[in-house]
Every structure is written in structure tokens, then in C-alpha cells.
Amino acid sequence: MVGRMERQSASSSASCSPSSSAAGTSSSSSACGGKKRPDILNMIRSATCLNSSSTDTGKGRSKQSSNKVTHGFHLVEGKSGHDMEDYHVAEYKYDKSHELGLFAIFDGHLGDSVPSYLKANLFCNILKEPIFWTNPQEAIKNAYRSTNKYILENAKQLGPGGSTAVTAIVVDGKDMWVANVGDSRAVVCERGAANQLTVDHEPHTTNERQRIEKQGGFVTTFPGDVPRVNGQLAVARAFGDQSLKAHLSSEPDVRHVPINSSIEFVILASDGLWKVMKNQEAVDLVKSIKDPQAAAKRLTTEALARKSKDDISCIVIRFRC
């Protein structure tokens, strides 16, 4: 992620089905990069339900569920001089006779260990919550909190970095639960109009600034011109970031969206897209494209044309095509 975190010098057991990889079909996966991982990450990949995505530019063929929900994704590595730090989930699975569509974008900073861990564990943690089927909103909040607690407790293995998240769970093609921390965003097209489903957790907003300052932190535009928590991080909520744990929040905003005939499609994307494109622009660009993978590719291509230098990850979910 370009510009979110001020980079510093060197001195300073679930049983779920496998997810899609960044390159190829929704049923495949590939190992990330060529860097040696901490042992804890190797253990995660072999023991948990969701393998890591590729760091390469990639795409996924559109897939359709039994409830006529289709999805496709497209990922582009940025031009910031570091490895891809965006990860995604886009898959269907069955739980208690219900079909679940699981979709997420995890936009990392200061390395990709935290988003990789989230890809492997966050949905499993949500679905393992005992109250998931009776109170999905609280289950999602509980899982976000417990996942972040684990990440912070294992910062020595997972590293100093962090990640934003936007997640969507589609239940039987009828209900969708959207949650986020940070500035990765979900936007729905409803009768042709764009409606933002998530909240951009930026440090300069009144509520976030007050919370940060109450916890002993501060918000400043120095260095640079972007408001940052303690001069470091350009989002007020995120997973990880051990050095800022006292002043950051991992509490998600959660929203329930009943899927009715007015809901056409949803776009999930990292800020590499939203920095250069307004919500309605994104919806207008792809509302006539019925193939969700082609729509996701169109959005990332346009973001590149608008000189986005960040990693760009985009998932399009289309209903009842």
C-alpha cells in the first residue's frame, strides 16, 4: 500500500474449504512470493482453511453459486517498489445446509504477513463463533476482536505490519453481512445508484480523532500532507500494527443488507481503486458489464489509467444474473 504507512529503515485448527488464488480459477491456490516465511505462517497454511493468494497480477474466472450469485476478481500489483500486500478471498462453501459466499479484501502495510494471516483465519474465526447463526453482527465483531488479539500477541512471528479489511458474507443469496476496518470499501449498486456500505476509518474524522486522542495518541499531517495516527498510519482502524496498538481500533463497522430485486451488484476494493475513483463512477463504469470478472478487470484497468500507483484488488459480486 502506497503512502498509508510511513516506512522506516531497518534500524528502527479449522476445517474449511480452500479459497481461490489470485491467479486462476476460484478453486485453485498458489504460494506467495519467494520470501522465507516465519514458521507460524507455514503452520497457518497447512492447518487452516484458506491458503494465501499469489502476489502476482491475477484474475479469477467468474463463478456462479446455486443461488445465482456470480463473482469475479482482478488484482494488480502496484508500482511502489515493494511486493504485493493485498490479499483476497472469493469462494462459496456450505455450512449447516446454508450456502455461504465469502468475499474479502485485505490491504496490508509494512509487509504481507498480517493480510496473509487474515486470509487464512478471519472467516474461519467468524464461522466458529457460537452465535453466528443467531447474531451474525456480534459474531463478526467478536471474531474481528479475537483475531486482532492473536495477531498482536504474535507480533514477533507476524512482524510489525498490519492490514485493513473489508469482508462480505452472502447467505443463501438472500442476506449479506458487510464489515470493515480501515479504508478498503464496499459499494452496492441499487437501481443504478451507488451506495457505500462501509465506513472509511480515517484519522482526521471527528469521532476517530477524539478516540485516538482519548487513548493518548495524536493525529498529524507531519511528515507529508496526509493525516496519520502518531505521524505513522493513515487509517484509524486496522489489524495488527503492534507499535500503535494502544491508539488503533480493530472494531469493525457491520451492516446487514437484505438482497432484494433492487440490488444489482457489489464492488469490494482496496483503496488503490477508491483513491482515484468515486463510488458512482465505479458503478457507472461497470453496470452494463454482466460478467463480474470482466467488470473487476475494467475497474482495475481504469484505476491504472488514472495513475493509481498502489496495489489494486477488486471483487465484483452480481446477484441473480
Curated annotation (Swiss-Prot):
Source organism (scientific name):
Oryza sativa subsp. japonica
Residue numbers binding Mn(2+) 2: 107, 271, 310
How many and how are cofactors bound here?
A: Binds 2 magnesium or manganese ions per subunit.
Note down the stretches annotated as region Disordered: 1-36, 51-70
Q: Which family does it belong to?
A: Belongs to the PP2C family.
Q: Where is the composition biased (Polar residues)?
A: 51-69
Instruction: List the protein's name.
Output: Probable protein phosphatase 2C 44
Annotated Mn(2+) 1 binding sites = 107-108
